[in-house]
Structures are given as C-alpha cells and as structure tokens.
Amino acid sequence: MELRFDLHIHSEQSFDGCMSLSEIVRLARERGLNGVAICDHDRVLESVPEYDDFLVIPATEISTERGHLLGLFVREPIETRQFSEAVTAIHAQGGLAVIAHPFEHSKDEHRLDDVMSRLDGVEIWNSRADRKNKNANAMARELARKWEMPVTAGSDAHVPEEVGGGVT
C-alpha cells in the first residue's frame, strides 16, 4: 500500500499562510493524499485533529542562522533560532529535524557539512525552492545522496493551489 504525504504545508497560523486546517485536510484528501505535516513558521498546532483515514502531523518551520529547519512530530514551540539548539530541542520532543529547501537561498554545497550528522533528513523536493535557485531541488537531492540521509518532499504550500505539489 502506497501512502502519500505532503510534509511541508502552512496554515493561516503562519504569518504568510491563508488556509484553515480543515481546508488543508479537505484539499489534501481530494488530491489523493493520506496525510500532511502542518509546518507553520515558528509555531505549532494548538490541537491536532485525529481522523481514521488521514494523518495530520504536528510540525513547525524554524528560521535559523543556517536556514529553515522542519521539526516533524513536535507539539511544543521551539523558541531558539540557533540551528544546533533547535535540532536539540526537536530531538528532545522526540521529533525529526529535517533541513528545509537547503539551497533555495544559497548555492554553497558545503555550507551544511558540519551539521549534517545531527539531522534526520533532507527535504529534497520543495515546489517553491526552484523559483529562486533553479537547481535548488537537484542540489538538495545530491546533499542527501552524499550524506546517505532519508529524504522528504513537500509543497511548502501557502495557498490552496499548492497543496499536494510535493509528495513523500
């Protein structure tokens, strides 16, 4: 059985999102997904709905000095903006630390070498990343391959049309 998840979506709780959680779930179901991760900027869902046939993963997207970091399966906000501290805080909650769109704003393929061993995965497909760097997703795939890291994909949806644009 194949499961399809969009592991990077923003709700209206993000400063730049506009969709309610119920709208995200409805759209994701219509598009054949089995679940989503709600990765609002620097915050987490106050309550996580449970469905028999659909999974909502509590998550967050943290802005750090090294770029954006997804904390999957976290239920408490991560207050720090320091990359290493944020990874530690995610792990303390039993979450997974995934580097999000690592080359959207930078083409330096070695900029994360010193922290890769602490991460749980690399977002290798982000449907918005190639807008700023046309090679961003290809570079992320190469980073994951080089470090033999698990991978994720997400739409980074901020508007309804984008939901399901990246699927793991």
Regions from the PLM with identified roles:
Residues 6, 10, 24-42, 96-98:
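Divalent metal-dependent hydrolysis catalytic cores, especially in the metallo-beta-lactamase
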Residues 41, 102, 127:
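Flexible loop residues that form catalytic
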